[in-house]
Regions:
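Long, contiguous binding/interaction regions
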Residues: 7-149
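Short hydrophobic/aromatic beta-strand micro-patches
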Residues: 2-6
Length: 149
C-alpha cells in the first residue's frame, strides 16, 4: 500500500510518520510516496510505453528539457520540450500529464523537492546539444544536489 501526500510537501512528514507507525501485516507492504516506475534502459532505447490521455499521446523518452533557473532551495525551473507541442498546446491537461510523467520518472518526493516550475515548448527542428533527455533528469538533479550552493 502506498501512502501519498499527493505532491503536497506540507504532508511529507506525516506520510513518513504514518508508514513508520503502520502495523506489520502479513502480505502487506507500506510504502511512502509514489515511487519511480521506469527502467532507464527502456527509456534510453525508446522502448517505454506511451502515455495516452484523451487526445494526447506522449513518451517520456521523446521529451527533452532545459533548466533555466536554480534557486537556493535546490529546486529548478525548467522548460520541457515536446515534438508535438503545437498540436497539444490547446489541451488544458497537457501540463498535468507532464507532471504525472515526471512523477513516474522521479517519484513523488523527488519531484516536489527538486522541481519548482515547468514551462512547455515545441522541440526545435534542429535539436540543440544543450537540451537534456528527460530520462536523464534524475541524474541531472543528483549532480546539482551534490554541489554546494
Amino acid at each position: 500500500m502506498t501512502i501519498t501526500a499527493n505532491g503536497n510537501p506540507a504532508y511529507f512528514t506525516k506520510v513518513e510518520e504514518v508508514v513508520k507507525a503502520a502495523p506489520k501485516l502479513q502480505d502487506w507492504k507500506f510504502t511512502t510516496f509514489v515511487q519511480p516506475q521506469h527502467a532507464y534502459e527502456e527509456l534510453e532505447n525508446g522502448l517505454d510505453k506511451p502515455y495516452v490521455f484523451q487526445d494526447i499521446t506522449l513518451k517520456t523518452s521523446e521529451l527533452k528539457f532545459m533548466p533555466f533557473k536554480y534557486n537556493c532551495e535546490k529546486k529548478i525551473d525548467m522548460i520541457v520540450y515536446l515534438k508535438n507541442f503545437t498540436l497539444y498546446s490547446h489541451n488544458k491537461n497537457l501540463l498535468q500529464l507532464i507532471y504525472f510523467m515526471m512523477q513516474d520518472l522521479l517519484g513523488e518526493k523527488s519531484l516536489y523537492e527538486n522541481i519548482n516550475f515547468v514551462e512547455l515548448g515545441q522541440l526545435p527542428d534542429e535539436e540543440k546539444n544543450e537540451l537534456i533527455c528527460m530520462y536523464d533528469l534524475q541524474y541531472y538533479l543528483d549532480h546539482l544536489n551534490s554541489q554546494p550552493l
